[in-house]
C-alpha cells in the first residue's frame, strides 16, 4: 500500500507561492522528496542530519 519513503529530510520551507508540484516521493525525480509546506507540496533535494 504505502511505499517506503526516500531517505533524508525536507529542508526549511521556501518562500514561494502555493503550488502542488507532487503527490508523493515517487512523483519527484532522482533523490528528491515531495515536501509538504502547508498550502504547497514541492519536490526538494533532501537534507541529511546526523
Curated annotation (Swiss-Prot):
WAP domain location: 3-47
KW Disulfide bond (keyword) present: yes
Domain of life per record: Eukaryota
One Gene Ontology cellular component annotation held by this UniProt entry: extracellular region
Subcellular compartments: Secreted
Keyword match Secreted: yes
Pfam families for this protein: WAP
Gene3D superfamilies: Elafin-like (4.10.75.10)
Disulfide bonds: 10-35, 18-39, 22-34, 28-43
Transmembrane stretches, start-end: none
Extra remark: A D-omwaprin has been synthesized to permit cristallization by using a racemic mixture containing equal amounts of L- and D-omwaprin. This D-omwaprin provokes B.megaterium lysis (after 45 minutes of treatment), but fails to inhibit growth of B.anthracis.
Family per similarity comment: Belongs to the venom waprin family.
Functional description taken from the UniProt entry: Damages membranes of susceptible bacteria. Has antibacterial activity against the Gram-positive bacteria B.megaterium and S.warneri. After a 45-minute treatment with this protein, B.megaterium have no visible pili and are smooth. Has no antibacterial activity against the Gram-positive bacteria B.thuringiensis, S.aureus, S.clavuligerus and B.anthracis, or the Gram-negative bacteria E.coli and A.tumefaciens. Has no hemolytic activity. Does not inhibit the proteinases elastase and cathepsin G. Is not toxic to mice.
Protein name: Omwaprin-a
Source organism of this protein record: Oxyuranus microlepidotus
Classification lineage: Eukaryota, Metazoa, Chordata, Craniata, Vertebrata
Amino acid at each position: 500500500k504505502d511505499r517506503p519513503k526516500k531517505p533524508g529530510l525536507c529542508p526549511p520551507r521556501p518562500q514561494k507561492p502555493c503550488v502542488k508540484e507532487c503527490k508523493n516521493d515517487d512523483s519527484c525525480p532522482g533523490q528528491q522528496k515531495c515536501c509538504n509546506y502547508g498550502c504547497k507540496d514541492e519536490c526538494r533535494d533532501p537534507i541529511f542530519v546526523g
